[in-house]
Design a protein with these regions (language model features):
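Polyanion-binding surfaces on beta-sheet-dominated domains and ring/shell assemblies
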Residues: 1-120
């Protein structure tokens, strides 16, 4: 399998927030993965704004949460679903994990890196 490359515009954003590629990303079997803190820094740097998350599914007893997050960057608007359950997270804080996943996906869409890089 061919190793995927990090898009140049994402490399530039990583550098703009004072991080190196090695600090901001890791390689998962040839697929670049970016850390959550790097995406948060990038979002803040370029001025991405988030609306209040919309909780779609909430079953605390089973540890399952799904929410929709919408973000804007100027006139660009993107949304994504974040989910957390015992099947995909060992953490005991499903609301925070669901929000983190949704925000990361929205940031990747807004910066044009969705499908090229994945979030942790």
């Amino acid at each position: 399998m061919k190793k995927r490359q990090i898009p140049q515009h994402l490399k530039d954003l990583i550098k703009a927030v004072g991080m190196s590629e090695q600090e901001a990303t890791w390689d998962c079997h040839g697929t670049p993965v970016i850390y959550h803190d790097a995406l948060e820094r990038i979002a803040s740097h370029i001025g991405i704004q988030f609306e209040k998350p919309d909780v779609i599914k909430n079953n605390v007893e089973e540890g399952f949460v799904a929410m929709c997050v919408t973000g804007t960057d100027g006139d660009k608007i993107e949304w994504s679903i974040g989910e957390a359950s015992p099947f995909n997270s060992k953490n005991s804080y499903p609301f925070a994990m669901s929000e983190k996943r949704a925000k990361d996906r929205v940031i990747l869409k807004l910066i044009g890196a969705s499908g090229f890089v994945y979030s942790e």
